[in-house]
């Protein structure tokens, strides 16, 4: 199977107004293949958020190589990184970040609108198909504020899939939900992973959910533990 994500010796240092650099990631190696469903765990301050920002092409590493679908992202311009991020990576966050004035359908269409600039029938069809897949066809014209927390997070999952990404980064996607809704959202992502072969990297503090992933990677003090 092809590698969707490959990290080779990723390091990250910060210089916060002093001549001394602080290194927060120390040579991270990680490989994910198409169809992987991986849990990323670690205590607060371990470097998880920094690592996720680098994987999501929101920040550049200080050293090492990051490859997405075999492409060395260190060789890309900022605009090329933005294009790659928009097409290859989907994001689901703990707080859904839906636009409250928009309907569920309009929220799912947002990544396509950013990419293409103008709504069309194909976008609406794609959004409706994704809302059907996450079980929200009946709510497609509801505003984001007129849905439950679990429904809002399902819309966020559909939005993450709008550009048919190879990799979805889910940062504590169930952390703001009750137990049943959290399980439902997790199972939805798991089903999509199995049906579409979409690779998922799930950041979670929930041991039960992590145990149901294919693999658990723990980050401690800026390194992969074990």
UniProtKB/Swiss-Prot annotation:
Matching PROSITE patterns: ABC_TRANSPORTER_1 (PS00211), ABC_TRANSPORTER_2 (PS50893), LOLD (PS51244)
CDD domains per record: ABC_MJ0796_LolCDE_FtsE (cd03255)
Any Pfam family the entry gives: ABC_tran
Record bears the keyword Transport: yes
UniProt xrefs under Gene3D superfamilies: P-loop containing nucleotide triphosphate hydrolases
Keyword field: ATP-binding, Cell inner membrane, Cell membrane, Membrane, Nucleotide-binding, Translocase, Transport
Stretches assigned to the ABC transporter domain: 5-225
Entries under PANTHER family matching the protein: IMPORT ATP-BINDING PROTEIN (PTHR24220), LIPOPROTEIN-RELEASING SYSTEM ATP-BINDING PROTEIN LOLD (PTHR24220:SF689)
Entry's family note: Belongs to the ABC transporter superfamily. Lipoprotein translocase (TC 3.A.1.125) family.
Function, in words: Part of the ABC transporter complex LolCDE involved in the translocation of mature outer membrane-directed lipoproteins, from the inner membrane to the periplasmic chaperone, LolA. Responsible for the formation of the LolA-lipoprotein complex in an ATP-dependent manner.
Record text on subunit structure and interactions: The complex is composed of two ATP-binding proteins (LolD) and two transmembrane proteins (LolC and LolE).
Identification of the protein by name: Lipoprotein-releasing system ATP-binding protein LolD 1
Organism expressing this protein natively: Rhodopseudomonas palustris (strain ATCC BAA-98 / CGA009)
Organism classification: Bacteria, Pseudomonadati, Pseudomonadota, Alphaproteobacteria, Hyphomicrobiales
């Amino acid at each position: 199977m092809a590698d969707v994500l490959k990290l080779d010796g990723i390091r990250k240092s910060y210089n916060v107004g002093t001549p001394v650099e602080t290194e927060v990631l120390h040579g991270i190696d990680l490989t994910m293949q198409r169809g992987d469903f991986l849990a990323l765990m670690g205590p607060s301050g371990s470097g998880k958020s920094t690592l996720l920002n680098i994987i999501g092409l929101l920040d550049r590493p200080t050293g090492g190589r990051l490859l997405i679908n075999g492409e060395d992202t260190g060789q890309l311009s900022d605009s090329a990184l933005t294009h790659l991020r928009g097409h290859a990576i989907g994001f689901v966050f703990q707080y859904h970040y839906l636009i409250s004035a928009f309907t569920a359908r309009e929220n799912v269409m947002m990544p396509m609108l950013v990419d293409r600039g103008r709504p069309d029938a194909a976008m609406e069809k794609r959004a409706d198909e994704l809302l059907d897949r996450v079980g929200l066809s009946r709510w497609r014209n509801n505003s984001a504020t007129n849905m439950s927390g679990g429904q809002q997070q399902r819309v966020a999952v559909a939005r993450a899939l709008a550009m048919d990404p190879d990799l979805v980064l889910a940062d504590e996607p169930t952390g703001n939900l009750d137990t049943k809704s959290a399980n439902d959202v997790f199972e939805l992502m798991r089903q999509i992973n199995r049906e579409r072969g979409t690779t998922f990297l799930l950041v979670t503090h929930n041991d039960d959910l992590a145990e149901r992933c294919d693999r658990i990677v723990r980050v401690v003090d800026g390194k992969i533990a074990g």
